[in-house]
């Protein structure tokens, strides 16, 4: 089963390759592949937060198994503060203090942002004017083919991934699940909703005298 085989939403490990690498050029993205309903809820919230904060696509890989699954989750699991909206958007007061060029244009794509995620303005804000193009741009947004600018912009984008990884590792749950004995001869790596299936296989193999453990990864 897999894409374009008549069962397009069935789980398949190869789907991850498509999600990770289908793009034009070297671009940044975040991919979540929840293993169960709890992770789907947590990671959907986190995906919106990261997409706004770091200005990049955040993809949550749901499939038929999770969508059709019936699972009991304690109501206390959902008892949490709402996620703040529009992370990374500057207020007009903050824009007044932000960097602008000599013509008063907001430097939307500054090279020196520490975490790589440039704060942004939204249309109509005073002091937020800048240019948006589909090509590589310099700090205000004008198209630039300068090698130095290109390197600086790509370095900035790559810093996003380092910052996001640190952000995810600081979460209460890392969504990396170890299963089986702490020491084993063989290891299995699985992502997404097929995690429980692989964990069951680990139990069966160990019951037969094999030495197997597994790691489920979903972010």
Feature map (PLM): residue ranges:
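Short beta-strand segments
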Residues: 1, 33, 59-63
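Active-site/ligand-binding-proximal alpha/beta "capping" segment
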Residues: 27-49
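Conserved structured core elements
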Residues: 10-13, 37-41, 151, 192
């Amino acid at each position: 089963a897999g894409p374009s085989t008549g069962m397009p939403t069935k789980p398949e490990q190869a789907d991850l390759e498509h999600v990770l690498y289908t793009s034009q050029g070297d671009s940044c993205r975040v991919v979540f592949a929840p293993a169960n309903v709890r992770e789907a809820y947590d990671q959907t919230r986190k995906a919106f937060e990261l997409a706004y904060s770091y200005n990049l696509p955040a993809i949550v890989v749901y499939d038929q198994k999770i969508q059709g699954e019936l699972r009991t989750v304690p109501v206390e699991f959902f008892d949490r503060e709402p996620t703040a909206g529009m992370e990374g958007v500057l207020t007009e007061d903050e824009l007044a203090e932000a960097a602008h060029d000599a013509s008063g244009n907001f430097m939307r794509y500054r090279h020196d942002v520490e975490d790589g995620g440039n704060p942004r303005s939204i249309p109509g804000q005073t002091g937020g004017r800048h240019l948006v193009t589909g090509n590589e741009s310099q700090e205000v947004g004008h198209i630039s083919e300068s090698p130095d600018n290109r390197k600086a912009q790509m370095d900035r984008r790559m810093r996003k991934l380092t910052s996001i990884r640190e952000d995810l590792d600081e979460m209460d749950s890392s969504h990396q699940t170890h299963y089986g004995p702490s020491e084993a001869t063989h290891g299995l790596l699985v992502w997404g909703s097929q995690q429980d299936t692989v964990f069951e296989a680990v139990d069966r193999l160990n019951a037969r005298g094999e030495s197997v453990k597994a790691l489920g990864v979903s972010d």
